[in-house]
């Protein structure tokens, strides 16, 4: 516990209003003196409880819920009543509850957002209010916001356009910043940009709570986002802004436009890439190989897949390959087949990853012919197969067996969310590779029984990366998030892998260890920021103290009454 946590907190609120503030409410844990000082006598049951007793009751109530969505709603209700209790409950049951507060359950919560809505959290900034964004940001009661997660809800997980229902994603992401990375909830703010929706189910739903209008696009959309960004810079000039679940056509352009203007990153592109590269590095370390020796096939060439590919290329170059050599080891397969330089329908970021058709002469096929996944596997002979397609079953038995035929121990990463959209299940992959594959998934899966072995499955979850990045940025007061900082995060994650440290187990650490993993990532990120001149230089001792000082624990502090 930090020295700050031991000191009393001076609070100007009292009575029912204090009980209605999730960041300050202790419920039945208010002491006798606090009940007197803050006019709470008679507003709470007589017995004074510890947070341990409150947590035990909350968990017993949680276990009465019948469905995962019910559990999600229950946890969110606690969060909106008492944030300290909410995060204490998560701390004690993180592996069990992480799939409930985030993927995969959060996807259903987004789809049902208007039906299960209970109370306000975060900011809803709609296009008709575009001239009042500064006023909207001023209405936020948190003056010391350090992390904002924003979405326009156009590409929520693998579910597409969810309108304002996408607010569930920033809320869930920021819950993980706190639960996994120790960022105080007082420093976080979820935001949804309501630019309309093209989802007919929402437009025709009488309960839909968002702006009933088709999505704004083009110049109007870009101007609206820029109004928001500039207002954020005025309100919180040192904030870390995370773009979340923007559509492919907007995600990369927004990142490219603003990455040198403020401290920001896109978790779908950069966070996903960092955790994927960390997973690849861990697998290579375990096999005694180099990343630069691998050949990687991607299924899904959207912004996420291409973002991972670019970071893999950057990592290969750090091991000595030149750019052309690294790019020849990357094969991107999308709905048109293998991306090649003779295709006319590729986006800019896809063109950089297209293979030269002239180099594929031995594969067969004429100019313009599609090269399907199986043909790519057969000819490229990859050692790594990564799925970010959102299409269930694309990793067929024939594909996986062909992969294994050329590589005794392939790394297979079906990363699509939610579980219903995964390219193949771990059980299928291990059955088809005689238990030899290394597997990391995007959604959580239970351990798989293969013969007499029970094999844990690593979840290639961005929660391994972004909380540590946030903690490192805040502790070092970094002004930007750079590619070097992301690579430092990936390397730190790889060094925490059980198959690296112990020679057995899953490719990634257990989620129960994620808070310590986040601290290690934070140190690596902060040091890299200092090395690149994006943060003030300090000694290692001062940096470690800053990380510990910024690491929040869900514990109640003593309160003292003060006036406004």
Curated annotation (Swiss-Prot):
SMART domains assigned to the protein according to its UniProt record, in alphabetical order: malic (SM01274), Malic_M (SM00919)
Entry keyword Metal-binding: yes
Textual note on the cofactor: Divalent metal cations. Prefers magnesium or manganese.
Residues engaged in binding NAD(+): 155, 268, 417
A Gene Ontology molecular function term of the record: malate dehydrogenase (decarboxylating) (NAD+) activity
Highest taxon of the lineage: Bacteria
Active site: 102, 173
Site (Important for activity): 268
A biological process from GO: malate metabolic process
Binding site for a divalent metal cation: 244-245, 268
Catalytic activity line of the entry: (S)-malate + NAD(+) = pyruvate + CO2 + NADH; oxaloacetate + H(+) = pyruvate + CO2
A GO cellular-component term linked to this record: cytosol
Pfam families, per database record: malic, Malic_M
Matches recorded under Gene3D superfamilies: Malic enzyme, N-terminal domain, NAD(P)-binding Rossmann-like Domain
SUPFAM superfamilies: Aminoacid dehydrogenase-like, N-terminal domain, NAD(P)-binding Rossmann-fold domains
E.C. code: 1.1.1.38
Enzyme class name: oxidoreductase
Entry cofactors: Mg(2+); Mn(2+)
Keywords: Metal-binding, NAD, Oxidoreductase
Family according to the record: Belongs to the malic enzymes family.
Subunit details: Homotetramer.
PANTHER family: MALIC ENZYME-RELATED (PTHR23406), NAD-DEPENDENT MALIC ENZYME, MITOCHONDRIAL (PTHR23406:SF34)
Protein's UniProt name: NAD-dependent malic enzyme
Species, as recorded: Pseudomonas paraeruginosa (strain DSM 24068 / PA7) (Pseudomonas aeruginosa (strain PA7))
């Amino acid at each position: 516990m930090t020295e700050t946590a031991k000191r009393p907190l001076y609070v100007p609120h009292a009575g029912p209003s204090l009980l209605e503030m999730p960041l300050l409410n202790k419920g039945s844990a208010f002491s006798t003196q606090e009940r007197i000082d803050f006019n709470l006598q008679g507003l709470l049951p007589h017995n004074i409880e510890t947070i341990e007793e409150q947590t035990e009751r909350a968990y017993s109530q949680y276990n009465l819920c019948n469905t995962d969505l019910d559990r999600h709603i229950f946890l969110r209700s606690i969060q909106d009543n008492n944030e300290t209790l909410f995060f204490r409950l998560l701390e004690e049951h993180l592996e069990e509850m992480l799939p409930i507060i985030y993927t995969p359950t959060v996807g259903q919560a987004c789809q049902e957002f208007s039906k299960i809505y209970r109370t306000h959290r975060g900011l809803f900034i709609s296009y008709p209010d575009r001239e009042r964004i500064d006023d909207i940001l001023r209405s936020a009661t948190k003056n010391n916001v350090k992390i904002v997660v924003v979405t326009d809800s156009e590409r929520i997980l693998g579910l597409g356009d969810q309108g304002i229902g996408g607010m569930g994603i920033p809320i869930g992401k920021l819950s993980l910043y706190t639960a996994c990375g120790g960022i105080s909830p007082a420093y976080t703010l979820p935001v949804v940009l309501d630019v309309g929706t093209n989802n007919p189910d929402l437009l025709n739903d009488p309960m839909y709570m968002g702006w009933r209008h088709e999505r704004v696009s083009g110049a109007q959309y870009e101007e609206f986002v820029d109004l928001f960004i500039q207002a954020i810079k005025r309100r919180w000039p040192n904030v870390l802004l995370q773009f979340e679940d923007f559509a492919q056509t907007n995600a990369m352009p927004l990142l490219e436009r603003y990455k040198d203007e403020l401290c920001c990153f896109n978790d779908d592109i950069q966070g996903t890439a960092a955790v994927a590269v960390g997973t690849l590095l861990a697998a290579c370390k375990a096999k005694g190989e180099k990343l630069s020796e691998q050949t990687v096939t991607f299924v899904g060439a959207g912004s996420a897949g291409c973002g991972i590919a670019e970071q893999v290329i950057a990592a290969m170059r750090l091991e000595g390959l030149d750019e052309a050599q690294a790019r020849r080891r990357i094969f991107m397969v999308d709905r048109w087949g293998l991306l090649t330089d003779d295709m006319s329908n590729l986006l800019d970021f896809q063109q950089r990853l297209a293979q030269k058709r002239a180099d594929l002469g031995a594969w067969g096929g004429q100019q313009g012919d599609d090269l399907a996944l199986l043909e790519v596997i057969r000819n490229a002979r990859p050692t790594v197969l990564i799925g970010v397609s959102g299409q269930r079953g694309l990793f067929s038995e024939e594909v996986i067996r062909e992969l294994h035929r050329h590589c005794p121990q392939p790394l297979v990463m079906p990363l699509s969310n939610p579980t219903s959209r995964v390219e193949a299940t771990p059980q299928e992959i291990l059955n088809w590779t005689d238990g030899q594959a290394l597997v990391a998934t995007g959604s959580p899966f239970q351990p798989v029984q293969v013969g007499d072995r029970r094999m844990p499955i690593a979840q290639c979850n961005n929660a391994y990366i972004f909380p540590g990045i946030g903690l490192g940025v805040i502790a070092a007061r970094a002004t930007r998030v750079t590619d070097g900082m992301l690579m430092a995060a990936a390397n730190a994650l790889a060094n925490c892998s059980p198959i690296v440290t112990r020679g057995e187990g899953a490719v990634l650490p257990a989620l129960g260890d994620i808070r310590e993993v986040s601290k290690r990532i934070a140190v690596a990120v902060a040091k890299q920021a200092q090395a690149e001149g994006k943060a003030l230089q300090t000694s290692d001792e001062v940096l470690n103290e800053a990380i510990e000082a910024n690491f929040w624990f869900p514990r109640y502090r003593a309160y003292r009454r003060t006036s406004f």
